[in-house]
Design a protein with these regions (language model features):
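Active-site capping/gating regions of soluble enzymes
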Residues: 1-155, 159-165
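Acidic, glycine-enriched catalytic cores built around paired aspartates
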Residues: 156-224
Length: 224
């Protein structure tokens, strides 16, 4: 999709951007991932007799996604710029939570019925590598199902105003350290992938540390 968009717009003399946060004057750009599981033409997420229509399988899937969220966060937010999107009040999540039809939560359950019930992962930005994002979603969900995990009660109301919630990683440095130590990531994605991805992102972090930004020039050129 990204390559196609760039090719089409190049013909019109334009360049699209998939940065998670292009401007500090605007909200960021998301890359939310909607997920549902089906067997023999029927959703295994749906149970008409259960609260919110969520089957036991879906509850375990959500629980796994929640547990995996901080450990796999770097796969959803792979760039230094990614973390500028997670700002309170911007419709981007800031805490590790799940909820029913709540756009301030990281994981949003949408349950209109048996054909539409799904989990919306609201963490990924527009800069996500969709293949890695899908893999991370499936890894967390599968871990939850295989381990028969159960989620905590869903968060309600404005998550931005809630207290005592587990924060999401604030920087790529934090996210990479969590990924590097994650047994879940290594079990489901493999040591070779994790080691390569971590090394690649640490190289990116070092490049960023050495860069002198326009903000620094405006801030300090005359003042210091």
């Amino acid at each position: 999709f990204k390559s196609g968009a760039k090719e089409v717009l190049a013909q019109a003399g334009a360049v699209p951007t998939f940065m998670a946060k292009y401007s500090d004057q605007m909200d960021g750009c998301s890359g939310h991932i909607h997920q549902s599981l089906w067997r023999d033409g029927e959703s295994v997420f749906w149970d008409a007799s259960a609260e919110h229509g969520m089957s036991d399988t879906m509850r375990s899937y959500v629980a796994g996604a929640l547990v995996a969220l901080p450990e796999l966060f770097a796969l959803f937010a792979p760039n230094v710029n990614s973390y500028k999107r997670y700002v309170s009040g911007s419709w981007a999540p800031t805490a590790a939570t799940w909820a029913i039809e709540n756009r301030t939560s990281s994981l949003r359950v949408i349950a209109p019925g048996p054909n539409g019930i799904r989990l919306e992962h609201r963490v990924p930005g527009a800069d996500v590598n969709s293949y890695l994002g899908f893999a991370a979603c499936l890894a967390g969900g599968l871990a939850g199902i295989e381990r028969r995990l159960q989620p905590p009660p869903p968060t309600s109301g404005n998550v931005y105003a809630a207290e005592g919630l587990a924060p999401l990683p604030r920087t790529l440095d934090q996210a990479i350290e969590l990924l590097d130590r994650s047994e879940l990531a290594r079990d489901y994605l493999g040591d070779a992938f994790v080691d390569h991805f971590v090394a690649m992102r640490r190289w990116e972090i070092e490049k960023h540390r050495r860069a002198v930004t326009e903000w620094e020039r405006r801030r300090y050129f005359e003042q210091v």
